[in-house]
Amino acid sequence: MKLKETLNLGKTDFPMRAGLPTKEPVWQKEWEEAKLYQRRQELNQGKPHFTLHDGPPYANGNIHVGHAMNKISKDIIVRSKSMSGFYAPYIPGWDTHGLPIEQVLAKQGVKRKEMDLVEYLKLCREYALSQVDKQREDFKRLGVSGDWENPYVTLTPDYEAAQIRVFGEMAKKGYIYRGAKPVYWSWSSESALAEAEIEYHDLLSTSLYYANRVKDGKGVLDTDTYIVVWTTTPFTITASRGLTVGADIDYVLVQPAGESRKFVVASELLNSLSEKFGWADVQVLATYRGQELNHIVTVHPWDTAVDELVILGDHVTTDSGTGIVHTAPGFGEDDYNVGVANGLEVAVTVNERGIMMENAGPEFAGQFYDKVVPTVIEKLGDLLLAQEEISHSYPFDWRTKKPIIWRAVPQWFASVSKFRQEILDEIEKVKFHSEWGKVRLYNMIRDRGDWVISRQRAWGVPLPIFYAEDGTPIMTVETIEHVAQLFEEHGSIIWWERDAKDLLPEGFTHPGSPNGEFKKETDIMDVWFDSGSSWNGVVVNRPELKYPADLYLEGSDQYRGWFNSSLITSVANHGVAPYKQILSQGFALDGKGEKMSKSLGNTIAPSDVEKQFGAEILRLWVTSVDSSNDVRISMDILSQVSETYRKIRNTLRFLIANTSDFNPAEDTVAYEELRSVDKYMTVRFNQLVKTIRDAYADFEFLTIYKALVNFINVDLSAFYLDFAKDVVYIEGAKSLERRQMQTVFYDILVKITKLLTPILPHTAEEIWSYLEFEAEDFVQLSELPEAETFANQEEILNTWAAFMDFRGQAQKALEEARNAKVIGKSLEAHLTIYPNEVVKTLLGAVDSNVAQLLIVSELTIAEGGAPEGAVSFEDVAFTVERAAGEVCDRCRRIDPTTAERNYHAVICDHCASIVEENFADAVAEGFETK
């Protein structure tokens, strides 16, 4: 027998290298075959509900890192709730209707307008489902646990029927109406857009300053007066029907030198405009409040048959322009509101493709709206006072990336104004994990207009509206419920397969259709109405979920998207918000903080991370960042996270190896019988348990990450495990000292594995497979540990906090000795301590081998003052010299008692007593010398 075989060197097959990329899929298959998700739900039946409702990603293409961050975050929350006494099923979902899928088919050569609509919709459905399958595998590969075989998909018959019923309830309450209000219009998509489908970019536009001649000054202005107007959308002058001024803004009537004409502009802007127009020696003839100019009549700059009325509007400012804006009710929300209130015509001079129509005038007809500036300038003639190019923030179609326009077209709207206050009141009841999120959503609802819910596309859920022969819209409780039942049985495609009369209840009549003829609506619903109905299609309709949901967790862009639409439809139907809490996340940026873009080549695909590092590293990264704000990710950042993972893994491997001969049922030492240092580590660990439990409850992943890494690096690696080898390797295998420490090791190992499970389920299960004494066959079926409290724990914490300060001072003294070449490593040291009474009391209180704690071979606590040259601190001083004696071949300490034993071992007296007691046969035979 060799001497080193008398050491209790930890033994384990748990690999140092994780091999995550190859092992994770194997484990995931094992979990699926073991039906772990289903077993977890069965275990939690009857417990309090926790419903995290999954916001549906759009089913198009493989997932990106933003998807991964979101789904991993949800998985961590659901797993932690499932292990904390909650019934927390997770139903993943997908959003499947809308323009992107139509665009994909178009790129594939499918010509929608040249084929049967039903066949086209079947192609859309087929493609959408293929993308659901693709993304499902992507999400499962991340280790996300959920009911993957029974997800919700917005194109399924049951979901579409639920959506129709949401619409029906809103129609019954009078919230659905048809109007020709201006809406965001995408000429590139040939469809209206919702606010959530808009993004803003800088756009270079031509702005014009021009003048309208006064036709009827109402006794205030003469007819040789011109009112100066500013516009950044010259094409809308073709539909201008009024000029709007601010009621409380001061305006001046001026005449520049050399001009026969008089002009009206905002007083505050006169100086800057005079410079812009080249006016000199401007004479101010009069000053008016805006309300004095109300109802003055001017003439359209080139269409003299059109009068333009001066009206009042709150939206007019003196921040830029002239303080007067031309008003085209067909091309702007503010214009529409003040225009209709004053009886102005709602003229629309641009068609759905952005082409100017005949009513714009023969010079404009057929031109693209954005190309008419030269024609407008020509028509204005000497009424044009100035032009300039400006860069301003402008709305774009978020899918086609093309600028959009406001355009009044007949659309279906969901009223928000009719129950706005009710929505705002519900927002006050929701818990927002970011206060700014509450403000953002509140302001959006407060300021938003009614919701245009109709779209002029094909792939979507039809609006369940019929028209009588006289054009009267029909959407009764009876007709809508009948459509819902048809969709539930056949899917919404039946709308396109059948004639209107075959979609109505049998025997249905209407006074507007004396001949029994009906038409059906051809517009579909906004996709935000699809996903915004999920609270009904999923949370209400799935028996395992509970409405309202406890939590919605999505990106911060969803304040204008899913959070918004879900809130409106839920309050409209039931008077309550669909969620109790909102947690929002920022965007994933590259390592430099730049937005990820395929064109920039700075994207990171989750699949690439899985191949190089494993999904576990992506999961750990999610906890390492504050995802309430924008976060950074790169392969370099992931390498750093991987290094942290390696430290966690190797620390736990040490615990596994050094408890391999520990049977918790037989070998556990009661807390009261532990050494002070072991009690301290137990108390510290339970502080960690509480911190992590609380952080899981508050969805504070970064807190978990920091607390866990700090405990492993500082409490374990840099302290407890640093001197542990002197106990667990060297003392007798069954000695009290070793069992005391193993008790702490095992407790930490089991509980930290459970605490890690929501974040690192693959690694946790791998560790669990080595814990043969634990009852559950999978750690995912266990519960998170509860934090314990202990008698005198504050006293223990205070004692050891003081000792850690003392230890830091001792380490500085040892470091100085090392630098002076007195010693090499600390085990070569004889440390002499010169304590005051406080430190002397402290050293007596730790009831442990202080030399062992400081990892020195010899320690002396001296009486009296410290000699000259000692390393001194306020309460203590140290001297360091090389320890006397020889190195023990077994414990590696330098000890005066180290000697050649008659059984061929050069060991100290302490090791000799251990060897002679535990290895009598080897002592009798003598140890091998080679």
UniProtKB/Swiss-Prot annotation:
Chain sites annotated for binding ATP: K598
Keyword Chloroplast: no
Cofactor, free-text remark: Binds 1 zinc ion per subunit.
GO MF annotation, one: zinc ion binding
Gene Ontology BP, a term: isoleucyl-tRNA aminoacylation
Protein's name according to its UniProt entry: Isoleucine--tRNA ligase
Keywords: Aminoacyl-tRNA synthetase, ATP-binding, Cytoplasm, Ligase, Metal-binding, Nucleotide-binding, Protein biosynthesis, Zinc
Cytoplasm keyword on record: yes
Annotated disulfide bonds: none
Co-factor requirement: Zn(2+)
Gene: ileS
